Amino acid sequence: MISALAVRLPNWLGDTVMAEPAVRGMRRAHPQAQVLLAGPWATVLGGQGLADTLVTYPRAWSGRLAAADVVRRLAPDTAVLLPNSVESALAAWYWGAGRRIGFDAGVRGKVLTDVVALPEPRRHQIDEYLMLAERCGASADDAEPTLTPPPADGAARAEARALLAEAGAHGGRRTVGVHLGAAYGPAKTWPAERVAELCRLLDTVGARAVLLGTAAEAPAAAAIAAEAPAASLAGRDRPALLPSLLAELDALVSGDTGVAHLATALGTPVVALFGPTDPALSAPRGRAVALTHPVPCAPCFYRVCPIEHPCLRGLEAKRVRDAVLALLKSAPPPRPALRQQ
């Protein structure tokens, strides 16, 4: 019987969201166990009844050592390692976990006690995480990430609504977020002229486009908003506010990003644009549609396109608009206009 279970979460936001079904399955399989989740985005899975303890596992090595000590004090008897790194396997050994479950990826297999062979061909990331959860006794009967949004009457949701109202949203119109960035690299980014065209097309059908992204994307978002009917919240959608902001949207358009996975898990419909990566491996599951433009070089998995970016440049704004409208047809009616305070 497992009494203390430590789960090393992936390092990226989207991968962490895709790990939710596996974590949920392990929690259900071992209700008596103390469950600890460790990873850079562990707090994303907080408040969901999935864990007793969350440990933010930072990227900096100095911070990781301190976090490893926190996990070690829990004295886990079992560790499930979702990343395929040597570091995660060594960390589990340092934690003192007698049972260490992970994929056989290179030399790390020598540190694991339960080695799971990577599937060939590779499967969707969600399904691969579920393979590890099954080794831990979990069921793989639910493979769709689900997160409960922040409370509608909470402070974070109120702040999100205020930001959207400032951006001209929720005036009885559909609000469509358009996320510009991708931590993976510029090869995942839809061209700015396509984004501007989408904003114009959405405006013609009575929808308000709101541009999202980090502070690094703020200049590009401002340039788009200057020539198209859209407002920019880029740089203002900080991580702590992001779940509330996404929950307030009627739909989201995004590249293959963690934000797309988070929005879908929260119940917001998503149109995900895929170029250099493979939707068969990482498309959002739920109320989402993945769009691609077939070209011979895709998926290349390059972070920077060495040619003219044909995969995403070939995705026409009208096609994206039509996909958004199809999702909105099955969505609840738009929210009423906000009262002026």
Predicted feature locations:
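Catalytic machinery of carbohydrate-active enzymes
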Residues: 1-341
